[in-house]
Amino acid sequence: MAKKSLKVKQTRIPKFAVRAYTRCQRCGRARAVLSHFGVCRLCFRELAYAGAIPGVKKASW
């Protein structure tokens, strides 16, 4: 889990555009965020297994 201060810091608009970065909406993780879904890979996996993300299922071939 991310620190509360980092979550608050993310909500502010940065002075320079290159300083902006994505953060998981669910847990606050800054790395491995899937921008299409807005969550990190770990939360995405949990939500996909739970069936909370429509159209996503476990691949098997």
From Swiss-Prot:
One of its GO terms (molecular function) is rRNA binding. The keyword Metal-binding applies. GO terms for cellular component: cytoplasm; small ribosomal subunit. Its cofactor is Zn(2+). Transmembrane segments: none annotated. InterPro entries: Ribosomal_uS14, Ribosomal_uS14_bact, Ribosomal_uS14_CS, Ribosomal_uS14_sf. Belongs to the universal ribosomal protein uS14 family. Zinc-binding uS14 subfamily. This is Small ribosomal subunit protein uS14. It comes from Mycoplasma pneumoniae (strain ATCC 29342 / M129 / Subtype 1) (Mycoplasmoides pneumoniae). The gene is rpsZ.
